[in-house]
UniProtKB/Swiss-Prot annotation:
Binding-site residues, FMN: 132-134, 244-245, 289, 304-308, 330
Cofactor: FMNH2
Example of a GO biological process term: amino acid biosynthetic process
Role, per record: This reaction introduces a second double bond into the aromatic ring system.
EC number: 4.2.3.5
Organism: Methylorubrum populi (strain ATCC BAA-705 / NCIMB 13946 / BJ001) (Methylobacterium populi)
Name of the protein in its database record: Chorismate synthase
Gene3D superfamilies: Chorismate synthase AroC
Reaction catalysed by this enzyme: 5-O-(1-carboxyvinyl)-3-phosphoshikimate = chorismate + phosphate
Chain residues that bind NADP(+): 48, 54
Gene Ontology cellular component list: cytosol
Keywords of this entry: Amino-acid biosynthesis, Aromatic amino acid biosynthesis, FAD, Flavoprotein, FMN, Lyase, NADP
Amino acid sequence: MSHNTFGHLFRVTTFGESHGVALGCVVDGCPPGLALEAEEIQAELDRRKPGQSRFTTQRREPDQVKILSGVFGDDRTGGRQLTTGTPIALMIENTDQRSKDYSEIRDSYRPGHADYTYDAKYGFRDYRGGGRSSARETAARVAAGAIARKVIPGITIRAALVQMGPHAIDRANWDWAEVGNNPFFCPDAKAAALYESYLDGIRKDGSSVGAVIEVIAEGVPPGLGAPIYGKLDADLAAAMMSINAVKGVEIGDGFAAAALRGEDNADEMRAGNDGRPRFLGNHAGGILGGISSGEPIVVRFAVKPTSSILTPRQSVNRQGEEIDLVTKGRHDPCVGIRAVPVAEAMMACVLADHHLRHRGQVGDRV
């Protein structure tokens, strides 16, 4: 299986399966001399790890990260661990696999999952928990994202769940401080209360629901990205689409821009106090012509409902026989919840990569 590496200069390669011994990543291209401790990576992983509320999978994984290479410290660094510029290898052991839950479906194709397509491509697959196609793989991305943030210290990246099922937040109530106060990473306290009762009903039905996640990067300087095939927004779209269960991505106003007139969509400019243009709006989501404008970068993506549900579903098996299938195992009733820290990580990886590419092409000019 190829295509396990993301990025050009800041390169992230992930490895591992849902029920394997461990998963992890190798980060190549991280500059030397950056302070990096396992605790900083762990803090990000703790936001994503399962089993923290009744609204996520009850699989209990501590997701303890181990740094295997790429950092070093001694008396000259004051005991701090600094990146050496060599590949940084991270490992997260799996400790709570329950593979027996999947023995009955090893020859069956679960509707909505990648079982059939993996079989069609490779002729062989790890059916335990979805193997490589499981969202468990995203733990490695979150770990890599913690390193990426070190490369772009002046940029703030935050994400939130802004819609669950048909219920969108009231943007007038947006408060970033609320994101850490509820299990949904929701910036609207009233919406979070609604989501609690709504998702309880979904769980009791043995069903699932989708979500919309919004991720915003502030402090991005103008100039990141390149025309045509190196567009920043193209790489961001690819990064978000690579997250499990994501079915659509938009930047700025996205699809809503199709309903606007030209004078409503184009962000007007005036002279700023720093000599640069000051934008009067941000319909473009911080990117023009594939290059960052200096405005906040705004990306949203849609996450489909978790395909593993208790309702019997029609399917077929490897022998071509028609079957009715009930999926067992432990699953998220809304996989979009834990996609929030994953979205931040992918934004960080893309921006770190483009920061290094920009510096390599034009120096430190911003």
